[in-house]
UniProtKB/Swiss-Prot annotation:
Keywords: ATP-binding, Cytoplasm, Kinase, Magnesium, Metal-binding, Nucleotide metabolism, Nucleotide-binding, Phosphoprotein, Transferase. The gene is ndk. Its EC number is 2.7.4.6. Belongs to the NDK family. Major role in the synthesis of nucleoside triphosphates other than ATP. The ATP gamma phosphate is transferred to the NDP beta phosphate via a ping-pong mechanism, using a phosphorylated active-site intermediate. ATP binds at K11, F59, R87, T93, R104, N114. Gene3D superfamilies: Nucleoside diphosphate kinase-like domain. GO terms for molecular function: ATP binding; metal ion binding; nucleoside diphosphate kinase activity. This is Nucleoside diphosphate kinase. Disulfide bonds: none annotated. The active site is at H117 (pros-phosphohistidine intermediate). GO terms for biological process: CTP biosynthetic process; GTP biosynthetic process; UTP biosynthetic process.
Length: 140
């Protein structure tokens, strides 16, 4: 297995309910290490840039509004096959379809307020990590 890094964002619905520690425990229990982490409040410009791939989608404005509605925790997770492992831990985007024991099955409120974001591939993970972190902020 290849050691990888992936980006995770604990979304405003989860930070509002003080779930950061419980979500981090799930990452660590699955063998992922948190090698960088910071709590921030995304600006509208940051959210629009980060989610720019969805700009033409009907849900874009709502997504930007939600992601700027409260603090988020951005973090870099590291481990064997980190991208796939994180996606498995998160569960399906729609929490009604998420497997029991996944973050979204356990904590998500709905398809938008689904508690976490995770990179979908190694190349996007590298781009997403660079969006939020300078190399010196990642301590492996």
């Amino acid at each position: 297995m290849a050691t990888e890094r992936t980006l995770s964002i604990i979304k405003p619905d989860a930070t509002r309910r003080n779930l950061t520690g419980r979500i981090n425990a799930k990452f660590e229990e699955a063998g992922l290490r948190i090698v960088a982490q910071k709590r921030i409040r995304l600006t509208k410009d940051q959210a629009e840039a980060f989610y720019g791939v969805h700009k033409e989608r009907p849900f874009f404005a709502g997504l930007v509004s939600f992601m700027t509605s409260g603090p988020v925790v951005v973090q870099v997770l590291e481990g064997d096959d980190a991208v796939a492992r994180n996606r498995a831990i998160m569960g399906a985007t729609d929490p009604r379809k998420a497997e029991a024991g996944t973050i979204r099955a356990e904590f998500a409120e709905d398809i938008e307020a689904n508690s976490v974001h995770g990179s979908d591939a190694a190349d996007t993970a590298a781009q997403e990590i660079a969006f939020f972190f300078a190399g010196v902020e990642i301590v492996g």
